[in-house]
């Protein structure tokens, strides 16, 4: 029975994780597993770096609202399998 309690604690710990989808403008969807209390900057960097993008060039939105790197899934009341939309910030322009 003593072994059962740590197993239950591990299950509770797994509830601290959330699976999030990040949807790009090109229709691609990437899934991330992140702790509910982890700042979203970690997810943002993990999305941008393999694509050769700077976090400063990209805008992340959840439910139509902009999110920042200091936001956490728990703060934004994100649920498992929620989707974060990614938009490339327009740069420059000639008139």
Curated annotation (Swiss-Prot):
Keywords: Diabetes mellitus, Isopeptide bond, Ubl conjugation pathway. GO terms for molecular function: protein tag activity; ubiquitin-like protein ligase binding. Residues 94-95 form a propeptide. Residues 17-95 form the Ubiquitin-like domain. The keyword Ribonucleoprotein does not apply. Pfam families: Rad60-SLD. GO terms for cellular component: nucleus; SUMO ligase complex. There is a cross-link at residue 93 (Glycyl lysine isopeptide (Gly-Lys) (interchain with K-? in acceptor proteins)). One of its GO terms (biological process) is negative regulation of DNA binding. Expressed mainly in adult and embryonic kidney. Expressed at various levels in immune tissues, with the highest expression in the lymph node and spleen. In contrast to SUMO1, SUMO2 and SUMO3, seems to be insensitive to sentrin-specific proteases due to the presence of Pro-90. This may impair processing to mature form and conjugation to substrates. Gene3D superfamilies: Phosphatidylinositol 3-kinase Catalytic Subunit, Chain A, domain 1. Signal peptide: none annotated. Belongs to the ubiquitin family. SUMO subfamily. It is linked to Type 1 diabetes mellitus 5: A form of diabetes mellitus, a multifactorial disorder of glucose homeostasis that is characterized by susceptibility to ketoacidosis in the absence of insulin therapy. Clinical features are polydipsia, polyphagia and polyuria which result from hyperglycemia-induced osmotic diuresis and secondary thirst. These derangements result in long-term complications that affect the eyes, kidneys, nerves, and blood vessels. Interacts with SAE2. Covalently attached to a number of proteins. Ubiquitin-like protein which can be covalently attached to target lysines as a monomer. Does not seem to be involved in protein degradation and may modulate protein subcellular localization, stability or activity. Upon oxidative stress, conjugates to various anti-oxidant enzymes, chaperones, and stress defense proteins. May also conjugate to NFKBIA, TFAP2A and FOS, negatively regulating their transcriptional activity, and to NR3C1, positively regulating its transcriptional activity. This is Small ubiquitin-related modifier 4. It comes from Homo sapiens (Human).
């Amino acid at each position: 029975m003593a072994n059962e309690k740590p197993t239950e604690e591990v299950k509770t710990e797994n509830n601290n994780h959330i699976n999030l989808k990040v949807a790009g403008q090109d229709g691609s969807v990437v899934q991330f597993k992140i702790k509910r209390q982890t700042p979203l900057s970690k997810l943002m960097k993990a999305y941008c770096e393999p694509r050769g993008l700077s976090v400063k060039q990209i805008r992340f939105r959840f439910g139509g609202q902009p999110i920042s790197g200091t936001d956490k899934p728990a703060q934004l009341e994100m649920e498992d399998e929620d989707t974060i939309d990614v938009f490339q910030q327009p740069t420059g322009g000639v008139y």
